[in-house]
Amino acid sequence: MNKLQNIRGVAFDLDGTLVDSAPGLAAAVDMALYALELPVAGEERVITWIGNGADVLMERALTWARQERATLRKTMGKPPVDEDIPAEEQVRILRKLFDRYYGEVAEEGTFLFPHVADTLGALHASGLSLGLVTNKPTPFVAPLLESLDIAKYFSVVIGGDDVQNKKPHPEPLLLVASRLGMTPEQMLFVGDSRNDIQAAKAAGCPSVGLTYGYNYGEAIALSEPDVIYDSFNDLLPALGLPHSDNQEIKND
């Protein structure tokens, strides 16, 4: 907790931290797979692939779908499919399809986690500078924040296309700290996955790990963040602000 004593700003991950984006992401992934006549994955499986950006998401989806198709065909006594298109090209095609479909479903398939809006408002009102660091493709980020009515709280927003190296590399966190006018040690980073905690450690930022996110199905404690919270509004007392229980509930 001592690392939280001299905090001047807070930066946040997006997917799995501020928002439950799995419904929209899974829908877009499945529509893209279906368009290529590949097996669809479903939300529960897609959740385990989230966190490293859209290109890696496509690689994971394609690898699984090709293996699943091969297994299904073998079970039915059918020969394997000859892959005329290299995997790299299929990933590129899948990404184009995903971008098209995700643009259609992102807003309706994304929800704020409990306590996020009020807690961000309280942090902003306290004078703390707030930033956002996400591996999500940049074109989707600003419209999503606006649709959720939380864009107004962030002084700096860094998407996955804004840096050469995405999390877990420290580059995006160092960029946000610089733009907020503070040292990494003065900026708390809040996330839900090992990528987030690894990026914070590499950048020299204190970190909070949230237990309710995605994180590839593993406990956030394994990544050893400085602090672990079960609820987003636990940030308030940790930063010397009153803990409000009068918070909004996630709208499913």
UniProtKB/Swiss-Prot annotation:
Catalytic activity: 2-phosphoglycolate + H2O = glycolate + phosphate
BP GO terms, sorted: carbohydrate metabolic process; DNA repair; glycolate biosynthetic process
Residues annotated as the enzyme's active site: 13 (nucleophile)
One GO term describing the cellular component: cytosol
Signal peptide interval: none
Metal-binding as UniProt keyword: yes
Pfam families the record matches: HAD_2
Biological pathway: Organic acid metabolism; glycolate biosynthesis; glycolate from 2-phosphoglycolate: step 1/1
Residues reported to bind Mg(2+): 13, 15, 192
SUPFAM superfamilies: HAD-like
Cofactor(s) of this protein: Mg(2+); chloride
Keywords: Carbohydrate metabolism, Chloride, Hydrolase, Magnesium, Metal-binding
The keyword Ligase appears for this protein: no
Sample GO molecular function, one term: phosphoglycolate phosphatase activity
Enzyme Commission code: 3.1.3.18
Cited function: Specifically catalyzes the dephosphorylation of 2-phosphoglycolate. Is involved in the dissimilation of the intracellular 2-phosphoglycolate formed during the DNA repair of 3'-phosphoglycolate ends, a major class of DNA lesions induced by oxidative stress.
Family membership noted in the UniProt record: Belongs to the HAD-like hydrolase superfamily. CbbY/CbbZ/Gph/YieH family.
Subunit structure: Monomer.
Protein name: Phosphoglycolate phosphatase
